[in-house]
Structure formats: C-alpha cells, structure tokens
Amino acid sequence: MCETSNCSSNNGSVESINSDCATVGCDQNKRDDARTLGRDICDEKSVAAASIKSSDFIKHETNFRKNHPSDHRKSWVLPLFHVPTNEPGVMWTGNFRRTPVMTFSQSCILGKCDAAEKLGRCYNMSYRLVRMESKLIRNILSAHGFQESANHLGKFNLLWTGGHLRPTQLRILSDFHKINHFPRSYEITRKDRLAKNVHRMQRLKGLHQFDILPPSFILPEEFQELCSAYAQDKVPYIVKPMASSRGRGIFLISHPEEIPCDEPVVVSRYISNPFLLDGFKFDVRIYAAVTSYDPLVLYIYEEGLVRFATVRYQPGFKHLRSQCMHLTNYSVNKKNFEFVHNDDANVEDYGNKWSLGALLRYLRSEGADVTGLMLRIEDVIVKSFLSVLSPILATCNLFPACQSKCFELYGFDIIVDDNFRPWLLE
C-alpha cells in the first residue's frame, strides 16, 4: 500500500501527508462544513465560549457550559478534521481516519481501469525499481497511474528493491516513501538465520511450542551434532545452500559424509512421510504481508499455490538422486517431460500447479479436516515471525521511521506429512 500525498505540480516533489491540507479531497468548504456540523451538535444555550486549539494539525473545539458550573465534567472535545471522501481507490485510516491510503486492485491488471489510473496521475505517484526487474510490478503500478522515476534524489513514493537499503539511505526517508523491505528481514528469508532464530525460541519457550521446522543443522559448525542425530534415526537428510532459491543447489544424502565441506550449508532431516495426492509429493506456497513489526501486523493471503513433483514418490534411500520425485520446485520440475502445464486460468485443479483453494476443496471432499490444517499452517507462519521478531525489531528501533515506511511480502513453503501436520521448509 502506498500513502497518497499532496504533490507540487511545479517540481514534482511530494509533500508530507501530515501537512495541514494534504489529505485527498480536502478543501476549505469541507472544513467549514465540519465546523458547522460540530456547532450544530452543541446546545447553543449552554455554550458560553468556544476556543479553537491546534494540536498536531488537528483542530479541536472545546465547549464550556457557563450556566452549569457543576457540569464541567461533561465538557468534551470535538475533533474537527478533514472530512473523508468516498473517492474510489482511497481508504482512510489512522487517527480520526484522516490519513488517505491508496489501494490496489488486481482487476486493473486484467483490464484497463481508468479511475485507478487517473487517481495515481492526479497525485503524481511515482516509483523506482532498484537491483531487480519485474514485469508484474511494473504492470500493476502503471495500471494505477504510477510513473517510473529516474530521479535518484528520493522523489518517488514507492521503492521496490531486490536488496536491503543501507543505513544512510534509511535515515533520509521521507514521510511519503514506502519501501518493500524491513531492515534485517533476512533473519527470516535466509535459511541459516531462520534455523538459528527458531532454535533460539525452542530453547526459550520449549521445543513443543516452536517445533515448526524439521531438525536442522548449520554446517560446518554443527557437523558433530548432525552426526549424532543421524546415528539415532538413520534417515535421509536434505542439503540446502543458505541463501539459494528455486531449488538451486539442493540435494539429498544418505550419510553426513556425503556433504561437501567447501561451503556453508543448512542440512535438515528429510520429511520422508509426506502426504501424497495420487502418489505425488507436493508442497504449498502461502503468502504473507507484514506492515509493522512493532506491533507485529501481518496478513496471510487466503489463496496460495500447490506445486507437485513430476515423479511418483517412493520412500527409502534408493531414489534419493531423483530430484523430480523429492523436490516440488517449479524451476526443477518444469524441465521434466512429465510436467503438465495448465493454460486455462479457470481450471484450478489440473496439471502440476493447483490453487490452494482447489486442494482444500479436494481434501474436504475426501473427509479431511481442512479447517484444522489451515489453523496449523497459520500457527506455523505466526511462530516463524515471532522467532525473528527480536532481531528485526532491534534494528528497526535504530531507524524509528522505518515502522511507518516499510512493508514486506513473504512466501512460505509448507509441506504436510501423512499425519496432516504442516512443516516449514523455508
């Protein structure tokens, strides 16, 4: 979400939304109407005096009752603020609902939406993409009237970056800026940092409270602990680079000695009893958006993706080298000739990619406890954020303005075992 703010037509600079008249649809007539409405509410016979006070750009009218001195306890403060308009694409939030926030609609991507585009252009909204390229992000912003800014002096409303900002950049952010990363959010996105944070919470709160990850070890420093665990269970383990994505560099092992020692990796116990659909392994991608870490405010999207392997699952050590059996990543399985594409957006339960809704409908038809499963998945996601809350919040406190300027979208990969228990993969 991007806060809409007043803009200068001369130089294109954007003023703070906290300025006296920077809210959407604010004009003098509406403020006069608000004052008139406030006075009409009061009984004119009981009003002896009225004084106008200004505090944080919000005007208040304090009414005193001259004829009833004993009723001073009934005196009240009537906030007189800019009257919110019902302008399409604008949602009013904050104290007294005086902060306008621009909302985005997915329908604007599918077809031209003149109202949304006009709104963005009216307020001279702009964006910058840094260290990344995304056709989807460009299309969404363009459909809502955002113009790409080539200016490097901070004259933009939204900065979408592929990395994190430096401390010097965080300190110069203005009120109208929105950034798509929180400082130090790699505490949850890097596999090694996530494992360390979850282990810390397991020590503090108990293993049963934060048993959301398969047992994981960070190598080379925890190699002996891995060997001890392997001696007890004798099960396959899965090796992952610390900061990779799309299934790159992932492989399974039958013994710790098979792990190369040339680079740091995260080794996790392989979930060898996955819940299968028609004999195929799958995982679920769930998206969550965080708008604040103090307090923690997160939104879990009700829809998601289900990604299937392209080779039927067979347990044991014999088939550990078959990536298309054990890994569900699209980037891995799309190379297999068995991969089935779905070219019909209206069909959600066909091919190697389903929607989460289609999966839940299928499970419900089979008599599964879908509600319980989704509650457990939600619990895993919430506890993941609680595990990283302390280090991220400590960094955010060094840059207080980040709390109102940053947001972040996260993707959670969840696998379900044959006991209908969800596990966080990354």
Language-model features, listed with the residues they occupy:
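Generic detector of isolated residues embedded in canonical secondary-structure elements
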Residues: 4-8, 35, 40, 44-45, ...
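Compositionally biased, intrinsically disordered low-complexity segments
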Residues: 17-20, 194, 335
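Conserved N-proximal alpha/beta basic substrate-recognition cap immediately N-terminal to
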Residues: 84, 88-236, 243-245, 255
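Catalytic core of tubulin tyrosine ligase-like
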Residues: 215, 225, 233-234, 238, ...
